[in-house]
Structures are given as C-alpha cells and as structure tokens.
UniProtKB/Swiss-Prot annotation:
This is Small ribosomal subunit protein uS15. One of the primary rRNA binding proteins, it binds directly to 16S rRNA where it helps nucleate assembly of the platform of the 30S subunit by binding and bridging several RNA helices of the 16S rRNA. The gene is rpsO. GO terms for molecular function: rRNA binding; structural constituent of ribosome. InterPro entries: Ribosomal_uS15, Ribosomal_uS15_bac-type, uS15_NS1_RNA-bd_sf. Part of the 30S ribosomal subunit. Forms a bridge to the 50S subunit in the 70S ribosome, contacting the 23S rRNA. Gene3D superfamilies: 6.10.250.3130, S15/NS1, RNA-binding. PROSITE patterns: RIBOSOMAL_S15. GO terms for biological process: translation. Keywords: Ribonucleoprotein, Ribosomal protein, RNA-binding, rRNA-binding. One of its GO terms (cellular component) is cytosolic small ribosomal subunit. Belongs to the universal ribosomal protein uS15 family.
C-alpha cells in the first residue's frame, strides 16, 4: 500500500525546488498525492476497510491544507503544481 523507496525518490527528484529538497510544499503534495492514489485503489477492492479510509481522509485533508497554503502565498507555484499533478482545483 505504501509507496516504495524508489518511487518516493523519483517523486522527490521530480518535484524538488533545489538539490536536497525533501520538505518543500511541492514535494509534500506530490508524495501525498501518490499515497492518496494508492489508497484510493486499495479502497476500490476493500470497501469495508474503515481504518484505511480514515487514513485516506486525513491525507486528503493534509494535502488540501498544503495546497491552500501554497495558493495563498505563491499562486504561480500553486497553478504549476496543480497542472503538473493533474488535480481538479
């Protein structure tokens, strides 16, 4: 269910704003999006897994807060990230 280390490293390389960047908003949102997509696929086949569902909702809320922060502080980075990830906002 969790993303593998190689997947995580690839996402960090793709969305990092500078070398060694693992904590920028873009990287955090990209990692959360990968987790959310994995959990969404899991929930399609395990409809009664309520514990995972609660975790999914928490991750969605965390991503929403990070996106709201980015939207309020740097709208151009926000728009670029939304387009790159293919999110509907």
């Amino acid at each position: 269910m969790a993303i593998s280390k190689t997947e995580k490293d690839n996402i960090i390389k793709e969305y990092a704003t500078h070398e060694g960047d693992t904590g920028s908003v873009e990287v955090q949102v990209a990692l959360l999006t990968a987790d959310i997509n994995n959990l969404t696929d899991h929930m399609k086949s395990h409809k009664h897994d309520h514990h995972s569902y609660v975790g999914l909702l928490k991750k969605i809320g965390h991503r929403r807060n990070l996106l709201r922060y980015l939207e309020n502080n740097d709208i151009n980075r926000y728009r670029e990230l939304i387009k790159k990830l293919g999110l509907r906002r």
